[in-house]
């Protein structure tokens, strides 16, 4: 009873880390803080020898029976696994070739294991396949079912022998078949064979279905008791071991298995378990949706591109851009350090005032609004724009209200669901504090008509700079055009003046010519012949 009191007391004195989510109105994003890290820092290798027994020399020639069916399954599985092993060796050669590894790994269901982790695991598997290493592991397991063995390259591995099927075959099945052949009336014997054979057949199926590399650690590859012993042997602190034992399902999901090969009547494979060497440092997650401002049918849209998980590790801030690199269990976040990127401490400024920070906060821009929902740990961001119907609802009463166009933040206390057209999103029921940080949407700082074409993952200050440069070019073009128009006006005036002067000169010339050729009205008519001097004009 005393140990229960101790546990209850420890729970009472342990500080509770509540979650706090802030909605940043300026950038249509949320930051959720209060998580604690569980970061993978290494791998722990466990080598299994699953011993089948001398089934190849057992034969059933006395007709169909349950024993014969199970025996045929076992022999067929061994042959299949040998084929898988041969194919896997060829595939691993490609994995170690940098030019081909990404294509080969893309065809394997890696689950949450990274390509780098699998490549490292394959290197260890190649070492274990050496005849001297296989012999050393078998020798270490001659008198025990579990032993720590050191490979030739100095890597220490935990070796585990699984002998239940072999013991049943040698001590029970072989004796019964030799005595009564396969037509055994004892149904219990057939059922026992099936039970002992189940783990072996499931291991074969998993390696066969996944090309020799499993995406996680099943109970057949490693029982719960075997997992607990392996975790307890890990070179890490008691607190970290305790946390991993409490989250064995996560350890299984983050691990993977690699087939070593078939050696006689033994199947050898290795299991890579994650070592979570960093725990309880602060972590937070950033989520975002498009923020758009419209004008006369044109839009200026921005979306934060620094979304993902962030964790403190050894004084640095590690960013996990792929949300799948981290998984939560309660307020703990399990992440793979190999997938993280170190970023400056100033990156947090993007969560305060994205438009005035000196840090290059990354965004994507566009001129076409996209309606979407981004679920956050304590609510949802809803980007609702033209031509789309958006609403929030309750599981009990249905739709509560329609949402306005633009970016909205819905807490999981305000609603149970968010609906965009015919798609319904269920909000989480995680408890925590929610806050709204008011601010003018940064997208409204831009003129939608002059907003540039789509840009991906650029610094926000670069967007401002590009628009300023574009505006400067527009202003310069206007000045040049204005000057050209003024020059053209003067040129036209000169042409008109020249034309007027030219026309005037022509008219004057014509007038002079006409003037000269014109005679007075009273002059005598010009006559041909002799002049009459006696003619006296009237006065």
Swiss-Prot record:
Entry-listed glycosylation sites: 57, 172, 353
Disulfide-bonded cysteines: 28-407, 60-182, 283-311, 292-301, 326-335, 350-361, 384-390
InterPro entries in UniProt: Fusion_F0_Paramyxovir
Signal peptide: 1-18
BP GO annotations: fusion of virus membrane with host plasma membrane; symbiont entry into host cell
Lipid bilayer topology: Single-pass type I membrane protein; Single-pass membrane protein
Chain spans, region Disordered: 520-539
Family: Belongs to the paramyxoviruses fusion glycoprotein family.
Miscellaneous notes: The cleavage peptide sequence for the hMPV F protein (RQSR) varies from the one described for other pneumoviruses, and differs from the furin protease motif (R/K-X-R/K-R).
Protein name: Fusion glycoprotein F0
Protein source organism: Human metapneumovirus (strain CAN97-83)
């Amino acid at each position: 009873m005393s140990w229960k009191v101790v546990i209850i007391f420890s729970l009472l004195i342990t500080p509770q880390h509540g979650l706090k989510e802030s909605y940043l109105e300026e950038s249509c994003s949320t930051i959720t803080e209060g998580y604690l890290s569980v970061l993978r820092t290494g791998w722990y290798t466990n080598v299994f020898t699953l011993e089948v027994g001398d089934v190849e020399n057992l034969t059933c020639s006395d007709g169909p029976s349950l024993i014969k069916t199970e025996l045929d399954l076992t022999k067929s599985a061994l042959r299949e696994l040998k084929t898988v092993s041969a194919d896997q060796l060829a595939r691993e050669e490609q994995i170690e070739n940098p030019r081909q590894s990404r294509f080969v790994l893309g065809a394997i269901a890696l689950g949450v294991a990274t390509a780098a982790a699998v490549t490292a695991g394959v290197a260890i598997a190649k070492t274990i396949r050496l005849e001297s290493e296989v012999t050393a592991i078998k020798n270490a397991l001659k008198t025990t079912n579990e032993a720590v063995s050191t490979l030739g390259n100095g890597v220490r591995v935990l070796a585990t022998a699984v002998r239940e099927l072999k013991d049943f075959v040698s001590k029970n099945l072989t004796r019964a078949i030799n005595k009564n052949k396969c037509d055994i009336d004892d149904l219990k014997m057939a059922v026992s064979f099936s039970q002992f054979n189940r783990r072996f057949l499931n291991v074969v199926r998993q390696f066969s279905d996944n090309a020799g590399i499993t995406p996680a650690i099943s109970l057949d590859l490693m029982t719960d008791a075997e997992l607990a012993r392996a975790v307890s042997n890990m070179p890490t602190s008691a607190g970290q071991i305790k946390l991993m034992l409490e989250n064995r399902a996560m350890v299984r999901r983050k691990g993977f298995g690699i087939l070593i090969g078939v050696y006689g009547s033994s199947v050898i494979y290795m299991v890579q378990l994650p070592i979570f060497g960093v725990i309880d440092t602060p972590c937070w997650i950033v989520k975002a949706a498009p923020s758009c401002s419209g004008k006369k049918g044109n839009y200026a849209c921005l979306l934060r591109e620094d979304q993902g998980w962030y964790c403190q590790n050894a004084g640095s801030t590690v960013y996990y851009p792929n949300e799948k690199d981290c998984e939560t269990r309660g307020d703990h976040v399990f992440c793979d350090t190999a997938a993280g990127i170190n970023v400056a401490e100033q990156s947090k400024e993007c969560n305060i005032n994205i438009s005035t920070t000196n840090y290059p906060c990354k965004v994507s821009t566009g001129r076409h609004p996209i309606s979407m929902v981004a679920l956050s740990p304590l609510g949802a961001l809803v980007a609702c724009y033209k031509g789309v119907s958006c609403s929030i609802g309750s599981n009990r009463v249905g739709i509560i209200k329609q949402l306005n166009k633009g970016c909205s933040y819905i807490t999981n206390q305000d609603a149970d669901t968010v609906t965009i057209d015919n798609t319904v999103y269920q909000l989480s029921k995680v408890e925590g504090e929610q806050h709204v940080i008011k601010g003018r949407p940064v997208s409204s700082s831009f003129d939608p008509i002059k907003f540039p074409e789509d840009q991906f993952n650029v610094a926000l200050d670069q967007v401002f700079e590009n628009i300023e440069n574009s505006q400067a070019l527009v202003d310069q073009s206007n000045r040049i055009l204005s000057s050209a128009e003024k020059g053209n006006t003067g040129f036209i005036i000169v042409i008109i003046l020249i034309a007027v002067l030219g026309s005037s000169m022509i008219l004057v010339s014509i007038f002079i010519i006409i003037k000269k050729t014109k005679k007075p009205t009273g002059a005598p008519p010009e006559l041909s012949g002799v002049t009459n001097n006696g003619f006296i004009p009237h006065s």
